[in-house]
């Protein structure tokens, strides 16, 4: 039995889907009371779409921000062999208090819960590449505390949460850490439940005519942006989570060959069928304008927090991930090979949300 947090969120749901299809695993999914009906509907879809899935996913009302995960008195800890901790606040503009409550205290509560499980084999923790903050250079999978500064409270609280996980690992907790970079839709279908990252640029381009204006922050030939499709992240996690050699490891689920900002923008302009007119702007001026001019952030559709990633100084080493996935056929596809799919999905599905499920 596995206990999973972050249901019915996109990555958690898709992770369950793959394990139901590929293994005989069964799940307890921790669900906030306000999402109970949504979770039950999602479970019904899983059972209807996957042969043999009926009864293998059971919801339990709880909350990672509460001691003991808010589980009912007398909840049995027997038989839970793995914990999959997906739940987090992913919002670049999140307030510190909420980020700390969910990302740090929530993770602490999950770790305390896992420590009390008599049958635990592994805890699988979903972190982020951006625990790197604004580290200048190549950030290794073994790196964490490098004196970095952070763009926002999402990054800083995920950093603190990973510190907690690593401390428990040193004390003997069997755990695996996964660090996705910026996750976009499925490379084959474009499907996603949340638009952020490059989708802000796609949306901005599609709102304009054939000649589109786009602010240029910094040197677009100098900085890269690391994008990974959700199917790569999930396929990698499912495979790595079943390899005993993964215990104790950290895997950066990032594109090993990321494009520069300039190349990404050119690819998106091509796929949106727009010719670009780029206007150089200092990043700090752009952030000030978005913050200071009433309504500008909403009109642009680009959160001020996203602007930092147009001039992000960090590259991500993926050596351990590539070594562990060698021979499995699981590889990160080239962004240019699926970017058109992302654009078409967004055009056909304009109502997908851009806010986190909290």
Indicate where each model-derived feature is located.
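N-terminal Rossmann NAD(P)H-binding glycine-rich loop of SDR-like oxidoreductase domains
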Residues: 1-24
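NAD(P)-dependent short-chain dehydrogenase/reductase
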Residues: 137-138, 168-225, 230-235, 268
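A hydrophobic C-terminal alpha-helical subdomain
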Residues: 204-221, 283-330
């Amino acid at each position: 039995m596995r206990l999973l947090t972050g249901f019915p969120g996109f990555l958690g749901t898709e992770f369950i889907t793959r394990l139901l299809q590929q293994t005989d695993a069964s799940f307890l999914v921790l669900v906030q009371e306000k999402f109970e009906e949504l979770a039950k509907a999602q479970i019904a879809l899983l059972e209807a779409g996957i042969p043999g899935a009926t009864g293998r996913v059971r919801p339990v009302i709880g909350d990672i921000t509460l001691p003991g995960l808010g589980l009912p008195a007398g909840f049995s800890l027997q038989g839970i062999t793995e914990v999959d901790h997906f739940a987090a606040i992913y919002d670049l503009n999140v307030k510190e208090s909420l980020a700390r409550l969910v990302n740090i205290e929530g993770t602490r509560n999950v770790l305390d819960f896992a420590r009390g499980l008599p049958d635990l084999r592994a805890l699988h923790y979903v972190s982020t590449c951006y625990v790197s903050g604004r580290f200048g250079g190549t950030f290794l999978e073994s790196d964490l505390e490098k004196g970095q500064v952070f763009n926002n409270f999402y990054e800083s609280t995920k950093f603190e949460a990973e510190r907690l996980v690593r401390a428990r690992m040193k004390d003997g907790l069997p755990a695996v850490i996964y660090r996705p970079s910026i996750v976009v839709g499925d490379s084959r279908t474009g499907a996603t439940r949340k638009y952020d990252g490059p989708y802000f640029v796609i949306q901005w381009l599609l709102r304009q005519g054939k000649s589109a204006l786009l602010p240029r922050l910094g040197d677009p030939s100098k900085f890269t942006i690391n994008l990974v499709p959700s199917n790569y992240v999930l396929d990698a996690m499912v495979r790595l989570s079943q390899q005993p050699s993964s215990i104790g490891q950290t895997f950066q689920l990032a594109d090993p060959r990321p494009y520069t900002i300039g190349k990404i923008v050119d690819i998106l302009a091509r796929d949106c069928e727009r010719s670009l007119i780029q206007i150089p702007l200092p990043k700090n001026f752009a952030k000030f304008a978005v913050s200071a001019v009433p309504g500008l952030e909403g009109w642009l559709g680009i959160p001020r927090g996203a602007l930092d990633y147009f001039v992000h100084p960090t590259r991500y080493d993926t050596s351990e991930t590539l070594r562990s996935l060698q021979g499995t056929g699981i590889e990160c596809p080239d962004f240019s090979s699926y970017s058109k799919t992302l654009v078409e999905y967004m055009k056909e599905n304009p109502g997908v949300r851009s806010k986190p499920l909290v």
